Amino acid sequence: MNSFIEGAYQPLLSVWRRAFLFSGALLLTACSHNASPPPFTASGFAGDHGAVPIWRKDTNDEVHLLSVFSPWHSGSTTTSEYRWQGDTLSLIELNIYSKPPEHIRARFDAHGELSFMQREVGGQKQQLSNDQIALYRYRAEQIRQTSDALRLGRVILRQGRWHADHTVTTCEGETLKPDLDSWAISHIERRQNHSSVEVSVAWLEAPEGSQLLLVANSDFCHWQPQAKTF
């Protein structure tokens, strides 16, 4: 599932440091939007160490969020799933695709108190320390705040299969032509030239423009959650 852009993470970091700083400004201007975001949204950002697509579903008073960290150059792909009832965190579930793989699960009651925790590394069950739990809770709140800003700022993630005419068949079955810059197009074409199958691409769209996020041989649609079952 590792889907980083080999050899291209530095240019992307340069672009996305500016874009992510600007996403903070989006939160300040989001109040001017009249329409509310749909219940199921996909967004994301590029951090210092990798790309992070985010899927989110808001149902009544519950927020369900899934993020996938894909490292630029080194490290392990990690999926992080969170649930909140109102503003109270109720679930943390992490899958770290390292060697050996690591799985972490923690549940919290209606008052936010820990009710269950387990860490499994290579099939061996372990307990989590209080410091580890505090760190995971902190990360959960950070990704929630980031998701809030991106959602209100109308930053949308799109992904699918790239075609020779520079169009993409998205995971939803639409055919789109991303408004990407020449560097992004050239990078996709270089990656495509070294692949026997159509590469997958992921990009972000916002009122301020579009930016390439990820390119890989693997099928991004295979692990994209669906609104009805998420």
List the model feature ranges, each with a label.
Residues 165-180:
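OB-fold (S1/OB) nucleic-acid-binding surfaces
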Residues 3-20:
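Bacterial N-terminal signal peptides that target proteins for export
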Residues 206-230:
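OB-fold/S1-family single-stranded nucleic acid-binding modules
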Residues 148-166:
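Structural detector for short beta-strands of small beta-barrel domains
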Residues 36-92, 96-154, 188-191:
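Extended, compositionally biased repeat/scaffold regions that form elongated interaction surfaces
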Residues 29-30:
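C-terminal motif of bacterial Sec signal peptides marking the signal peptidase cleavage site
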Residues 185-201:
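Short nucleic-acid-contacting surface segments enriched for D/E, G, S/T with interspersed K/R
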Residues 163-165, 202-211:
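Short, charged beta-turn/beta-strand-edge "cap" motif at the junction between a beta-strand
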